């Protein structure tokens, strides 16, 4: 059985491999997802300038509730999409951070899509 430490090493290797071909621009920034055991974080990043354009997390006061982790991820996806559309961002590149497209990562992505982001 693969241990948690080994699982994270594999994820980091996968993320580094994907990031070589994945980059955000001012016209089409990158939506980065980080998932911890308790929270989920999303950032929209312009890699050319090295600037975070918008961010949302399950720790934000308007999102943090006593809900399941998947429900919180859905709220984070809706919040990041709203912040992006307020700044005029419609298209993004989705960076799942080496995580499988399943569960919380999938819930965040689908909520962002339904809220108006295109990827």
UniProtKB/Swiss-Prot annotation:
Query: Which InterPro entries does this UniProt record tie to the protein?
Result: Ribosomal_uL18_bac-type, Ribosomal_uL18_bac/euk
Q: What does this protein do?
A: This is one of the proteins that bind and probably mediate the attachment of the 5S RNA into the large ribosomal subunit, where it forms part of the central protuberance.
The protein in question is named Large ribosomal subunit protein uL18
> Which NCBIfam families has this protein been placed in?
L18_bact
* GO CC, alphabetical: cytosolic large ribosomal subunit
* A biological process term (GO) from this entry: translation
rRNA-binding found in the keyword field: yes
Family in the record? Belongs to the universal ribosomal protein uL18 family.
Return any one Pfam family short name.
Ribosomal_L18p
Highest taxon listed in the record's lineage: Bacteria
One GO MF term on file is: 5S rRNA binding
Sorted UniProt keywords: Ribonucleoprotein, Ribosomal protein, RNA-binding, rRNA-binding
